[in-house]
Structure formats: C-alpha cells, structure tokens
C-alpha cells in the first residue's frame, strides 16, 4: 500500500529538496484517457505560488478541464491520496480508466 513520504506528500518533498522551485500538484487524479479528452472533467491544482497556480489553472481550462483551486501545497497530500483511490477504482473495481472525480454544487 502506498504511504506518503515523511514530508507529507511527494510534492512537499520536491518543494523541500528544491526550495527555489515553484512546485504545484496537478493532473494526477485521472488517467491519460481523460487527459486526452477532458470534456469538462475537474482538474484540481494545489500550490503556494499564486502566479504559478494561475498559469496552471488557465492551462487546465484551455485543455478543456474545469479548473479547481485546491488550496495550498499542503493539500497535495489529499490529491496524491485521491490518485491512489483513482488507481484502485480503475484497476480493481472494474470502473476502467475513463472516469474522473467530479465536484458538484447543488
């Protein structure tokens, strides 16, 4: 079973190793099939650098995703765990690789 690194997430470990880098977590909670044809799928982006996050959120929108600001980089741990759940559902629960998580409001 996957366990997060001592830094809390892989993204946090990268940020700690490269303190001058503008590290974001994005595009990790769906498969390549959704990347190829997003059709409005939600794409969460977590990071501490507002300017870098704005670029990635705009990129997600331009690609056809519904961009979602997932907050600071510490939330990368949540996104990494969401990816673990996606992998399980895709490979062990019969959902296949062409699904994505959607965040809806009533």
Labelled PLM ranges:
Residues 34, 41-106:
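Active-site-lining helix/loop region of Rossmann-like oxidoreductase modules
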Residues 1-2, 39-43:
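Short, flexible active-site loops
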Residues 1-33, 52:
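Rossmann-fold NAD(P)-binding glycine/threonine-rich loop
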């Amino acid at each position: 079973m996957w366990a997060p690194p001592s830094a809390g997430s892989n993204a946090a470990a990268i940020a700690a190793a490269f303190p001058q880098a503008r590290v974001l977590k994005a595009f990790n909670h769906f498969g390549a099939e959704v990347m190829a044809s997003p059709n409005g799928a939600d794409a969460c982006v977590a990071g501490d650098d507002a300017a870098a996050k704005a670029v990635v959120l705009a990129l997600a929108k331009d690609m056809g995703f519904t961009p979602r600001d997932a907050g600071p980089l510490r939330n990368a741990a949540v996104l990494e765990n969401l990816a673990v759940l996606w992998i399980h559902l895709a490979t062990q629960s019969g959902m296949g690789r062409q699904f994505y998580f959607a965040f809806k409001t009533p």
